[in-house]
């Protein structure tokens, strides 16, 4: 009896697809750091990294080698186990968040019926990594940064979840494939424009990206909750942040811009082009907006984003009830 049954072959193909997708995501997250530095250089009328390799193309490799050989230092009075666990949780939770995103009609790591809930669960798990990093470092700046990050993330995750409820109500499913298929005629960005705006803002805040990078503000907290990290532990936080940008960009495309749908080109090409556009938008936002105060960030969330998401949800419910009559 052969070991290679049709069921086993199907499982191996699914595992291979998952490995390929996740490796591509990690690679995109790593290369985005180089792309960001080049784009910021152009935006600020300077060159950016252009010495290592042709046009600076090997700068990322040089940074990886440098980071790999840096001393993996642990503070003397820190909680070593939790200090080591924090970057692993951060990297893993952000990477697994991409698992529910369908790259094409046949390519996805996991086709879950509760796909959106899985993403929100992974986003909530990432908060523990920040808290663990701040608490275990035994550093006042790390702890202050962790407290800022946890309060900001938990607050904006409320708006993140509520902004998606209109999309779920229209599609009638939490499954990402069903949501993409429901946009065959009209992308969700048109009927769910306020939901899209709120989701994009909350996505930037949850990723702790500028202008919502108060937990890592160098001028105030000296890099916040990962001030004590070095070597590959810092590298996991660093790459994890860019993986978060890739994931949020991919979710914006999937939920509001038709996912892989588009004329002429193959589905995965359309998905990649749309996702790359929003990744560039993340970078341009960093280049063009100032950093507000922390109290202004929290006030904006509860006084602007929350009413906007509730208004969008009420309007969506009213339209669905009207069409059902």
Swiss-Prot record:
Enzyme class, spelled out: translocase
InterPro entries: NADH_UbQ_OxRdtase_su1/FPO, NADH_UbQ_OxRdtase_su1_CS
First-listed, main subcellular location of the protein, grouped into a coarse class: membrane
Residue intervals passing through the bilayer: 11-31, 81-101, 114-134, 154-174, 186-206, 237-257, 265-285, 304-324
Reactions catalysed: a quinone + NADH + 5 H(+)(in) = a quinol + NAD(+) + 4 H(+)(out)
Keyword Cell inner membrane listed: yes
PANTHER family in the cross-refs: NADH DEHYDROGENASE SUBUNIT 1, NADH-UBIQUINONE OXIDOREDUCTASE CHAIN 1
Family label: Belongs to the complex I subunit 1 family.
Protein name: NADH-quinone oxidoreductase subunit H
Gene behind this protein: nuoH
